[in-house]
């Protein structure tokens, strides 16, 4: 039996460990867009196949 707890397609336990590589701040998971959002850096890192791509060059800039 699989004990993995998931939010969308990312493991919640992994989400608790991840921080923004630029600011070292917390990340929020956006299930609709399948992204990890760093509000402090104003970047959204993509999650592809359940794997967070934590490269600033791959992140989408958040503009208001």
Curated annotation (Swiss-Prot):
GO cellular component: cytosol
A Pfam family matched in the record: Trm112p
Protein family per UniProt: Belongs to the UPF0434 family.
Official protein name in the record: UPF0434 protein BOV_A0835
Organism, scientific name: Brucella ovis (strain ATCC 25840 / 63/290 / NCTC 10512)
């Amino acid at each position: 039996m699989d004990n993995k707890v998931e939010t969308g397609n990312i493991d919640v336990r992994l989400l608790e460990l991840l921080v923004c590589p630029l600011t070292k701040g917390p990340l929020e998971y956006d299930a609709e867009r399948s992204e990890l959002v760093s509000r402090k850096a104003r970047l959204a890192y993509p999650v592809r196949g359940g794997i967070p791509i934590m490269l600033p060059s791959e992140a989408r800039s958040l503009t208001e």
